[in-house]
Amino acid sequence: LDEDSLSEVGQWPWPRNQVAQIVSTAFKLGTAVLGFDIIFAEPDRMNGDNVVKSLVGLDTETIAKLRSIPKNDSIFGKTIKSAKRIVVGQTVLPIERVYQDRKPLRNRVFERQAKGAPKPREWVTEVGGILRNVPEIERMAAGHGILAL
C-alpha cells in the first residue's frame, strides 16, 4: 500500500477479491513469498450479505443473487491457499478477547529451552488474547506472524 497504489486502485480497504487478484498477479510475476502486515479481522464489507444489509428496497430476486455470489473473504482465502507461500498477520491484545466461532489454530505451543538459557516463560510477556483474521483467510495461510502495533 502506497500513494501510487491508492491512486490507482482507490481508497483502502480494497475488496478482498481485488486483493486476491493482486496477489495472483504478484505470484505470476515471480513473487517467492508474500507476507501481509495487515490483519483482516472483520468480514469484507463488500461481501453479498453486507451489501444486502446496506441497501434499502432491494427485491427478493436481487437479494438472492447478491447472497449467492461467492464471498470476497472466501475468494481471497482460496487464493492464499493456492499460492502456498503467504503469511498473514496477527496481533496480541492486552485484554482477553474470545471469539466464540474461532477455535485456536494450535492447541498448544511446544516449548524448548537450551541448556543454561533462561526459561521462556520468565521473559515472554503474557497476553490476554490475540486478534486474528477471519477464518476463511486465517486457515488458508502457510504461516502466521505476530505484528507489534
Question: What spans do the regions from the language model cover?
Answer:
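Non-transmembrane functional regions of envelope-associated proteins
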Residues: 1-149
